[in-house]
Every structure is written in C-alpha cells, then in structure tokens.
A protein has these predicted regions:
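Catalytic alpha-helical scaffold of carbohydrate-active enzymes acting on polysaccharides/glycoconjugates
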Residues: 1-188, 215-238, 244-291
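Glycine-rich, positively charged active-site loop/lid region within alpha/beta enzyme cores that binds
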Residues: 182-207
Length: 291
C-alpha cells in the first residue's frame, strides 16, 4: 500500500519561471492492440502507428530542435526494439527518455503478475539497447497495481500515469518515494484533435476537429494557466503522439503553439526529469525550513 504526500505550502519554481510547459512525446508502434477488439492483430490500426517511427518522430524532432525545446519521450519497449534508430536520435538530441509499457498494453485489463513482467521487459530493453537507466515511467491505462509495482520493484524517480492533480505530489510506500507528475487529455495534441463524440463516428470512420481548433484549445489552456501563474505555481502538460501529431498539419499545430507560448515572459519548456528536480529541491527546502 502507498500514500500521497503534498507540500505544506505552494510550490515555488526557480526564479523567473512562471509557467513550465512539460513536454511529452509518445512513441509507440503496437501491433497487438486495436481500436476494434474483434480485429487483432489489426494491420489497418498498427500501420497508422508505424507512421510515427517512419515520419512523425523525425518531424517532431526537427520542430523541437528548431525551438530549442528538450522534453520527455515516452517510448514503448517493443517500439525501441523495432525502431532503435529513433530512440538513439532522441537521446542524441538531448531529450529525456521514459518507459511507456512494452507494446502499449492496457494495464488495467491485465493481472498484476503480467503487468510486472511487461514492465521488467521494457526496462531491460532500454538497458540493453540504449544503456539507459529509466528515471521515469508512464503506464498505458494504469491499473490498481501500477503505483504499488513501481514503488515495490523499480527505482524510478517519477511516474506520469495519473490524471488527478494540477501539480506533482509524492507517492510513498515500500520504504521509498516516487514523484507523481499528472497529465491529462485536455492539452494532448492527439486528443484535442478528435471530435466531440470520440475518435470513431457511428459509421466507423474517424472524426477529427481541425488543426485550427486544436491550436485554439491549446492557446486557451495556456492563457488560463499563464494568468493563474502570476499568483501561484502552475504547470502545463503538453502531450503529443508522433503518429498523429507528427503528420504535417498537426505538427504545424505544435510548431505554432510553441512559437506563441515563447512570446510570454517566464514560460519554460521542460522535461519531466527537470521538473522533478525543481519540485524536489523546493520540497526539501520547505521541509528543512520547517525543521
């Protein structure tokens, strides 16, 4: 079992930081999961995922490099094994790397033992192919066991699987602590791009809002958080999936949004590793001042 720990005072970001934008790029290429459960494996569905490794990831790397943005790439173990050249390029570009299950399995549907096996398999893939000790993790559709397993079996510094808070907090159990950095769908370029009735219409076809709508949605969230950031600590999760946001019109949404946000004083695009370091430093300082 585990419990949450929250700071007694408002978090304080480093001097000059008003709104950190925490960038996540999901890099996945699953072949055994489908939008349509009766079609597995589903060549139609997984060929869409392949676009990320073939084109989308490279386009996103170019855009992030153009703006000097270094974020976190959440990579599935099987995707790393199939397309190691993408992950090596991500690492070379200076981005942080985190695990994102093995083949994007929905962990909420799996037994605890199976989830642990897949987590270990993913961690091993990063150690073997990249020489990388994973510092962070985001599970696909977390189960009731996910946090327990992270605390009991792994030495991650942060997890990003939950959707339940505006700011990071500590989860504590099994004699250790992990920082939980929540994210949500409302600033996910993939999800704000989908239609109001969900990804698939009654006719079984994709519904999609326009790129212009997606950009407006991101700007609206940014404006609200930037205003709030004048009074207290806030952060903005910004999530992209390379097989969706890496397509030309969606990639332009990311490019244009970064250009927009960079105009504002105190806005910093950052990775989960960096945000975790800032948060932990302030949390320790608060505890020391109380002691």
């Amino acid at each position: 079992m585990w419990k949450e720990k929250h700071p007694s005072q408002s978090v304080r970001w480093p001097q000059g930081v008003r709104l950190p934008i925490v960038v996540s790029v999901h890099h996945q290429s699953e072949e055994m999961t489908s939008l349509f459960p009766d079609r597995q494996p589903d060549p139609f569905d997984y060929s869409e995922r392949q676009y990320g490794a073939r084109r989308g990831a490279w386009r996103l790397l170019e855009i992030l490099d153009k703006h000097g943005v270094r974020g976190t790439w959440l990579i599935c173990g099987a995707t790393l094994e199939k397309y190691p050249e993408v992950s090596r390029a991500v690492k070379k570009a200076g981005h942080s790397i985190a695990g994102h299950t093995y083949e994007h399995e929905m962990m909420c549907n799996l037994p605890r033992e199976t989830e642990l096996v897949l987590m270990n398999k993913t961690v091993s893939a990063f150690e073997d192919l990249l020489g990388e000790r994973l510092r962070g993790w985001r599970t696909c559709f977390a189960s009731h066991n996910t946090i327990d397993l992270i605390l009991e079996h792994f030495d991650f510094e942060w997890d990003g699987s939950m959707w339940n808070d505006d700011l990071p907090y500590i989860v504590e159990g099994y004699g250790r602590e992990v920082l939980e950095i929540s994210f949500h769908a409302y600033s996910d370029v993939a999800l704000v791009a989908l239609g109001a009735e969900g990804p698939v219409s009654a006719y079984g076809t994709w519904q999609s809002n326009t790129p212009e709508f997606a950009l407006r949605a991101l700007k609206s969230m940014f404006d609200a958080l930037y205003e709030r950031g004048a009074e207290k600590a806030v952060m903005m999760p910004l999530t992209v999936h390379d097989f969706i946001a890496g397509r030309p019109s969606r990639a332009k949404v990311l490019d244009d949004f970064i250009s927009y946000a960079k105009q504002f004083e105190g806005v910093v695009f950052t990775s989960h590793d960096q945000l975790a370091a800032w948060w932990q430093a302030d949390y320790r300082a608060q505890n020391e001042s109380v002691a």
